[in-house]
Amino acid sequence: MSKLFWAMLSFITRLPVPRRWSQGLDFEHYSRGIITFPLIGLLLGAISGLVFMVLQAWCGAPLAALFSVLVLVLMTGGFHLDGLADTCDGVFSARSRDRMLEIMRDSRLGTHGGLALIFVVLAKILVLSELALRGESILASLAAACAVSRGTAALLMYRHRYAREEGLGNVFIGKIDGRQTCVTLGLAAIFAAVLLPGMHGVAAMVVTMVAIFILGQLLKRTLGGQTGDTLGAAIELGELVFLLALL
């Protein structure tokens, strides 16, 4: 289990992980690491939340929110934001399915992708600032949001097919079973309930699950399946939906 955690941490983040900690784990077995996604999200959100706490007293909530979001982006290498941008460029191009998938592979940023990035990043900053003004714990909110968003991404993997012939997303999409999905969602729910007591966190997770499930069905209808880019988009949108549900 520890090897899986470290392998997943190095796979979906840019945090330094000694190679020997994940040595001996075959790439084909990475799908089992889905159950570590909520824990990795918890770690990322906690670090980002700590940055907010340290900076809030010095520069106020808006700037603290800006830097906490920036730290979160740096820790993931913009991996998920890139997926969000590519997904929006492809889906909103209104082309054929094959052409959409080609556009999503294009490394150039299009108008729809750029607008999506601006909207999501600004929305996160504004929501975090508002939550802070309402006296909510940003550390707990971010930790729960990142855990839940990565946990609910399993909804785009279970019983979905990969829309391309090959790619990184193929490691997970269609490769996880019902038990792994339930364990992943269960861990995310536990983190949300512990960090945000009074059913506030669980209610926000339910809203997030519904939103991500609907997103998955829409993408399945549009693209014929899921890709690594759509998983990244689901994680970014899941974070935002969860935070919005806390308002």
From Swiss-Prot:
The subcellular localization recorded is: Cell inner membrane
> Per the UniProt record, which residue ranges are transmembrane?
34-54, 59-79, 113-133, 138-158, 194-214
Domain of life per record: Bacteria
One Pfam family hit: CobS
- Induction record: By cobinamide.
Which keywords label this protein? Answer: Cell inner membrane, Cell membrane, Cobalamin biosynthesis, Magnesium, Membrane, Transferase, Transmembrane, Transmembrane helix
Family to which this protein belongs? Belongs to the CobS family.
Q: Which organism is it from?
A: Escherichia coli (strain K12)
Q: What does this protein do?
A: Joins adenosylcobinamide-GDP and alpha-ribazole to generate adenosylcobalamin (Ado-cobalamin). Also synthesizes adenosylcobalamin 5'-phosphate from adenosylcobinamide-GDP and alpha-ribazole 5'-phosphate.
InterPro entries per the UniProt record, alphabetical = CobS
At the top of the EC hierarchy, this enzyme's class is transferase
* Gene Ontology CC terms: plasma membrane
Pathway where this protein functions: Cofactor biosynthesis; adenosylcobalamin biosynthesis; adenosylcobalamin from cob(II)yrinate a,c-diamide: step 7/7
Kindly report the protein's main subcellular placement as a broad class.
membrane
Q: What is this protein called?
A: Adenosylcobinamide-GDP ribazoletransferase
Q: Which cofactor does it need?
A: Mg(2+)
For this entry, list what GO says about its biological process. cobalamin biosynthetic process
- Which membrane topology term applies here? Multi-pass membrane protein
Q: Name one GO molecular function term.
A: adenosylcobinamide-GDP ribazoletransferase activity
Q: Which reaction does it catalyse?
A: alpha-ribazole + adenosylcob(III)inamide-GDP = adenosylcob(III)alamin + GMP + H(+); alpha-ribazole 5'-phosphate + adenosylcob(III)inamide-GDP = adenosylcob(III)alamin 5'-phosphate + GMP + H(+)
**EC number(s) per UniProt?**
2.7.8.26
